[in-house]
């Protein structure tokens, strides 16, 4: 990590003509009050019983798929390619079982509680990403997770970070930066990787800027975020 940060820092320094003010472009962090709120144990929200039964089956299907994937990984390690390939069909069947449970809930969405909907959107986004390679659909479902009034706070914060990563992967750098900034404002614990990601996002954003001034400002923000990542890594 430290070697990578040093390379990034050196590279970023070469891209700017002057060293920016130390705090320039660094994100606002969560307040002590917000961190306390996130870490305070609250009464767990409860899904409607019929929804909970379906979601449990979704979780069981994901567990099954995960076990099969691990078996497949071990078979590949042992160079048993034929047996490993056969696992693809089993994984596909397990995923299809989980997706079927979600699909059966969708016609009822409008009548469900907000918390119920948030969990359905969350698991659908997981299927979109992990098994279906449907990034636009995953983004759409994560946005719905964020927008639901009764979404669990920690799940909403997690969704901010995932949305940032997904938008960046789709070259929507403005949205990626915006969701990362939201994440920083709400995250109880910030690691160097998050600053590296924000720094990379600003570098990419700089390449899209038509104004030289805006491009330079984005590069300065990138430099400071990578430098902050190095500070945190060195402090460990």
Residue ranges of model-derived segments:
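Generic helix N-cap/helix-start motif at coil->alpha-helix transitions
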Residues: 49-54, 113-122, 152-162, 175, ...
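N-terminal leader/linker segments that initiate helical-solenoid repeat arrays
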Residues: 13-123, 130-140, 154-158
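Structural register within alpha-helical repeat arrays
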Residues: 57, 64, 124, 163, ...
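Structural motif corresponding to the intra-repeat A-B loop/turn of tetratricopeptide repeats
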Residues: 131-132, 170, 205, 209, ...
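Residue at a conserved register position within TPR or TPR-like alpha-solenoid repeats
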Residues: 61, 128-129, 160, 167, ...
């Amino acid at each position: 990590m430290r070697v990578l940060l040093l390379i990034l820092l050196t590279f970023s320094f070469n891209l700017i003509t002057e060293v920016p003010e130390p705090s320039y472009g660094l994100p606002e962090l969560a307040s002590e009050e917000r961190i306390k709120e996130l870490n305070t144990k609250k009464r767990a929200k409860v899904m409607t019983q019929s929804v909970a039964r379906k979601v449990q089956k979704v979780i069981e299907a994901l567990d099954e798929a995960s076990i099969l994937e691990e078996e497949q990984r071990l078979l590949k390690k042992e160079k048993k390619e034929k047996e490993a390939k056969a696992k693809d069909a089993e994984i596909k069947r397990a995923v299809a079982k989980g997706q079927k449970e979600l699909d059966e809930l969708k016609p009822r969405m409008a009548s469900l509680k907000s918390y119920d909907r948030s969990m359905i959107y969350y698991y659908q986004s997981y299927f979109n990403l992990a098994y279906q390679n449907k990034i636009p659909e995953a983004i759409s479902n994560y946005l719905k997770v964020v927008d639901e009034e009764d979404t669990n706070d920690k799940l909403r914060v997690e969704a901010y970070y995932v949305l940032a990563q997904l938008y960046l992967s789709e070259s929507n750098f403005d949205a990626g930066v915006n969701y990362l900034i939201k994440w920083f404002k709400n995250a109880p614990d910030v690691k160097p990787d998050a600053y590296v990601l924000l720094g990379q996002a600003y570098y990419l954003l700089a390449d899209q800027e038509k104004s030289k001034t805006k491009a330079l400002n984005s590069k300065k923000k990138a430099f400071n975020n990578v430098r902050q990542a190095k500070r945190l890594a060195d402090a460990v």
